[in-house]
Amino acid sequence: MSHKVSKKLDEEQINELREIFRSFDRNKDGSLTQLELGSLLRALGVKPSPDQFETLIDKADTKSNGLVEFPEFVALVSPELLSPAKRTTPYTEEQLLRLFRIFDTDGNGFITAAELAHSMAKLGHALTVAELTGMIKEADSDGDGRINFQEFAKAINSAAFDDIWG
């Protein structure tokens, strides 16, 4: 059944998921350990309790090998991605605001290139100058060189930051 669900995702969504998956697959063995999956979830702002995490692992690990492979990962996240309510805005405004505040380290209502670089490095994803400038350019729709909350929310919801994970 999970295979049928994944067929409904478009190629771009599958590629984005693959990039996210690969960036957290530290040893590049094609599977995520529980530690790697936990890091991925935290980077996405999802912080399940230990019980919720165990349930998530049990649900995802269909081979019962203690690892989450890419098809299992796709099967796990596909229902969320395909849900009509989630398709246009995968995050609540509260979640986006919380995430925005993490990146807006000085609290002035804008994310600068320096704040973005620092926050991504803290999340374990150091950015090259090209990645950093590309992300700012992609998200900064008014061209002022910084990202306000509306630009941030739009970028996150449209996966404009997919280069973060690659």
UniProtKB/Swiss-Prot annotation:
The keyword Calcium applies. Ca(2+) 2 binds at D104, D106, N108, E115. Ca(2+) 3 binds at D140, D142, D144, R146, E151. Disulfide bonds: none annotated. GO terms for molecular function: calcium ion binding. SUPFAM superfamilies: EF-hand. Residues 12-47, 48-83, 91-126, 127-162 form the EF-hand domain. It comes from the Eukaryota. Keywords: Calcium, Metal-binding, Repeat. The keyword Metal-binding applies. Ca(2+) 1 binds at D25, N27, D29, S31, E36. Pfam families: EF-hand_7. Potential calcium sensor. This is Probable calcium-binding protein CML17. It comes from Arabidopsis thaliana.
